[in-house]
Amino acid sequence: LDTDLEKICGDIDSAREAGADIVVCYLHWGSEYQREPDENQIYMAQTLADRGADIIFASHPHVLQKTDILTSEDGRNVPVFYSMGNFISNQRTETLPSIANKRYTEQGMIAVVDLSVMKSTGEIIEKTMRVIPTWVDRYGSPTKYAIVPLDADMNSNAALNASGHLSRAQEALQDVTALLGEDCLKGINMPGISADAEKSEKKAA
């Protein structure tokens, strides 16, 4: 773990030295089918945020995990997507009979982060993070797969109409909303630096 973490931190340093305005990390970590990040994921995320990462995306557990906003040592707000689930996969209720969390393997997300940058300084002044939840549908012969956005148009989705799986998609949306919260689906705005860091800067000035 420490060897991998040291290498990633070195990559962050190299990116900054090369003039990168924004550093994005994408991690392959965590335990399969676990819906909560483990202590290693949490430790690594905070370490990378402190080292200079601006956004952290991740996958591998094959199920969704929570999102978070970390505060780095220098006061930046750093969005973390601990696991983005399965975007497209054959892992599902029908194919994983022995896995307790099998239905959650059908769920995924499109993670969206919008950045507002001060052109004169390159400083990130605002970030918005949100999630578009998705569900993998499988139906037909020959087998067809469809990525279904779990949104207001779900009831009229062509794939769900063909498969008859609307109720499963609706259940998936309930699962995702309970895990991530409605605010994350709508969008969370945050300043580039945390409110506490901003107060400290003003006091120092």
Predicted features along the sequence, with ranges:
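Acidic, metal/ion-coordinating pockets
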Residues: 1-205
